[in-house]
Every structure is written in C-alpha cells, then in structure tokens.
C-alpha cells in the first residue's frame, strides 16, 4: 500500500483488453474471417425437369386434367414456391440433387463431411436460411412458408438416399430486385442508436383462440392486401405529432448513418433535454407499412430499462423519430475494449432481464438481444434499444417460427425454424453474457454457415476458460443457455437467481465506459 493518501483515494483504472475484439480473427480460423461478403446470387433454376408448382392447401401438383376442364381464372403469381428435391446418401455421405449454389456454399462452409453425415437436416436448414432472400433486412433474416399442409421448417430429410423436397418460397415483395442479405463476421457495432427502422408486422388477433389454428390464421394474415404508399402516408399523419421538428429541436449534430436513415443528437428547445433524432426518407424504405407498426409498438413500450420513444414528426417524405439519448454508447464498446468483472456483468444482466420481463409480460419478443442493442448512460444506466426485429405475440399465436435476428446470438430453435416463444431472448442474453466475459459471442470467427450449423447442433456453447468463472455464474449461464426450452429460465425466474445478488451499483460501469471511449479514441 502506498503511503500517499491521495493515491489511495483514486480507484485503479479498469482492465483494458490488449486488443479490440471487433475486428480480430481470434486466431481460431484465420481463413474463415476472409469469406466473401458479396451478395449471394439467387438459387439457380434447373432447366430439367421443370420446377413444379405445389398447391398451397392440398400439396398436389397443379396442371391435372381436372384443372384443364375447370379453367379457373389465372391471377398474377403469388407465394410462388420453387421446389428443390435434395437427398442424402447415408452410405456415401453425399447430398444428391442439391442446387449448384448451395453446393458451392457448402464446399466453402468449413462444415466437415463428418458433421454433414451426423446431421444432414441441420445442413439443409442453414443452407436454406443463408441463401434465402425472402425478407430484406440489414442482417440476415428468414420467413419460412407457413401454409396448410406444410411444416414450418425444411421438410424432413430421408437419409437412405431418396429425395426430399426443400421448399424455397419466392414471395411477391416490393423489393424483389434487392440483393440477398449477407452475414458479416461481425456487424460494425452500434456507435450510437437506432440503425434499423422496420419490424415484422404485428399479428392481428383472430376470432378462434385455439392455438392449433395458428397456421390458418397466419395464412389469412399473409393474404391481407398491402397498404398503398398513399394509405401509409395517411396513416402516419394520424400517428405523428403536428409541427416542424427543426423548430422544436436545435443544435443538430450527426452521430450516425444507417441503412434506414441518419441519426442526430439535438436539444429540445422547451425542455433543454438532449435527444436522439432519426431522420428517415420514406421514399427509400421498401416496406413503409412496417414503420407504422414500429412507431405504434414503441409508443407502448415505456420502461426504465428501455430506450424510450419520445415523439415523431412527418415533414414531406421525411419521418423524424425522436428517442431518448444515452451518451455512454453501446455495451459493445465496453465488452470489446475493457474487461468486466462478474459483479458488473450481473448488474447489466439484471437490468436487461427487467426490460425483458416487461416486454414478455406485454407479449413482445425482442428477438435481437446482443451487446450492440444495449445502450449505456454515462452514470451507468442500462437500456435495451433497436426494436427493428421485435414481434408481438397473441394468445392465438403464442409461438413464432420466423428466423430473425443476428445469427451468432440466435437460439437453436430459431436457427432450426421451430416454433418459439419469449425464451429466445433469454438464450440471446446468455450469449451476451459470454460476450461480456470473452469480448465476443461463440463461433464469431467461424464461417457463418458453420456457425449456424454449430448453433443448431452443438447446443450450449463451451466457454474458453470455464474454470475462471464462479459456480454461481456458470449456473446462471446454464439456465440461460438450456437447450430444452421448457427448462430454460424465464425473465421472471432469472431475476431471482442468486448470481444477480452479486451485482455492483450501476455507477461501477462508468469507469468502464470512460475507459472504452479512451481506448476507441486511441485506436482511431
């Protein structure tokens, strides 16, 4: 101990990671980090034989003599299904009938022959996921067909060598010419807030409360006519506030640029409050109707652990969304630049669980929990943000089967496109806790396809140095990362876990935030 009293009063600087993990390859697989990030071409259509159109309800081939006699009115193509027959020979360990594009992806995926033979169905699932372009988002996402007579996932694979049908749906979309989504080794972490603007449509309640009717109600929802641009603008005018945001807010300073718009900080003239304002050019939004859903959802989500929606304005074709501003930046800055202790990790987990308990109680699944989407105040406050992927669930649709979110944080039931519920957020929270320990999520340095395969088949990921963690922390992680969804803890249950009782005051995060900002400044 020093004899200098002044030095004793000054706390030691928080530990800093020797190098940022954001752009590192981790040394695990240097080749995997160099995989191509170019948009993938569409699945090539086979010339022989011609692709068959499968009847949505009966599953039978169209074009029979009966159809020729009936001569029904021909309407424009809708919900087109390109059926691909893929088989797997368990003896040779080879797939048969696989599209050339899928075969090329598999060849460069680093999924070994042994892994392919061990679980060929998982291989097909991740190939279909990776190559799908049915939903255009900043990060890879997928909506599987949910038609009567079809399972929600890829059809079961016959491992004896006979063919199976992998249904690839080509939806009638507004942005059908857009390039397929791409998975990056890790997306550039959020410098500030709000990099996406669209969410999945909120399921409308249906009359039949029987859960078994979910497929039919989902089918009805998909048949709902799309809103025209004029209808969307009219609806927005009924939601937003009247006025010019450039008169109500001053000192605009650009802090970020996302695919959906530009983000500024500004000051409320009347209150003197600093806010974040996202300016969105609606003409550049392919799915404008989803913005309405996002605003309506955000208006309802008022909670101390959620970055709160404040106001919105419409000026011409420009939509201004005003949100609470947190100057501490994202948790990603802290986990990649500093080392957190267990008590600090417990504090962050507690705050996030409080937000999730609130969301889940209101039938909302966030679906994209990760450090990028956790924002920090300079005083240490912790808040969830970015509801670009959130979804509301109703008693009639208590499970969802869309594949949405950022792959490395996805729960296995999402990757394999099984029906899922709010506990997908708990799995992602567990992965985020590993981020706080190791600086990155598991499999980040793997080829994306292999990462998806490992998530689908490996179950709970292994820690790099589990012996360094306390038994109580390991138990908390196990409760979050339980493969059996029924055994996985809920937000309400985990808030009672003994690990959270170790949490330090939120003010203990401030030195980490400052250290991260300093480290990032030095790295520039």
From Swiss-Prot:
The modification Phosphoserine is found at residues 2, 20, 55, 58, 64, 141, 152, 197. Activated by binding small G proteins. Binding of GTP-bound CDC42 or RAC1 to the autoregulatory region releases monomers from the autoinhibited dimer, enables phosphorylation of Thr-402 and allows the kinase domain to adopt an active structure. Following caspase cleavage, autophosphorylated PAK-2p34 is constitutively active. CDD domains: CRIB_PAK_like (cd01093), STKc_PAK2 (cd06655). Residues 69-112 are annotated as: GTPase-binding. It catalyses: L-seryl-[protein] + ATP = O-phospho-L-seryl-[protein] + ADP + H(+); L-threonyl-[protein] + ATP = O-phospho-L-threonyl-[protein] + ADP + H(+). The modification Phosphothreonine is found at residues 60, 134, 143, 154, 159, 169, 402. Residues 69-137 are annotated as: Autoregulatory region. ATP binds at residues 255-263, 278. GO terms for biological process: adherens junction assembly; apoptotic process; bicellular tight junction assembly; cardiac muscle hypertrophy; cellular response to transforming growth factor beta stimulus; dendritic spine development; intracellular signal transduction; negative regulation of apoptotic process. Full-length PAK2 is autophosphorylated when activated by CDC42/p21. Following cleavage, both peptides, PAK-2p27 and PAK-2p34, become highly autophosphorylated. Autophosphorylation of PAK-2p27 can occur in the absence of any effectors and is dependent on phosphorylation of Thr-402, because PAK-2p27 is acting as an exogenous substrate. Residues 74-87 form the CRIB domain. GO terms for molecular function: ATP binding; identical protein binding; protein kinase activity; protein kinase binding; protein serine kinase activity; protein serine/threonine kinase activity; protein tyrosine kinase activator activity; small GTPase binding. GO terms for cellular component: cell-cell junction; cytosol; focal adhesion; glutamatergic synapse; membrane; nuclear speck; perinuclear region of cytoplasm; postsynaptic density. Residues 169-178 have a biased composition (Acidic residues). InterPro entries: CRIB_dom, CRIB_dom_sf, Kinase-like_dom_sf, PAK3-like, PAK_BD, Prot_kinase_dom, Protein_kinase_ATP_BS, Ser/Thr_kinase_AS. Residues 67-81 have a biased composition (Basic and acidic residues). The keyword Nucleus applies. Residues 249-499 form the Protein kinase domain. The record marks 212-213 as: Cleavage. The modification Phosphotyrosine is found at residue 139. Interacts tightly with GTP-bound but not GDP-bound CDC42/p21 and RAC1. Interacts with SH3MD4. Interacts with SCRIB. Interacts with ARHGEF7 and GIT1. PAK-2p34 interacts with ARHGAP10. Interacts with RAC1. Belongs to the protein kinase superfamily. STE Ser/Thr protein kinase family. STE20 subfamily. Serine/threonine protein kinase that plays a role in a variety of different signaling pathways including cytoskeleton regulation, cell motility, cell cycle progression, apoptosis or proliferation. Acts as a downstream effector of the small GTPases CDC42 and RAC1. Activation by the binding of active CDC42 and RAC1 results in a conformational change and a subsequent autophosphorylation on several serine and/or threonine residues. Full-length PAK2 stimulates cell survival and cell growth. This is Serine/threonine-protein kinase PAK 2.
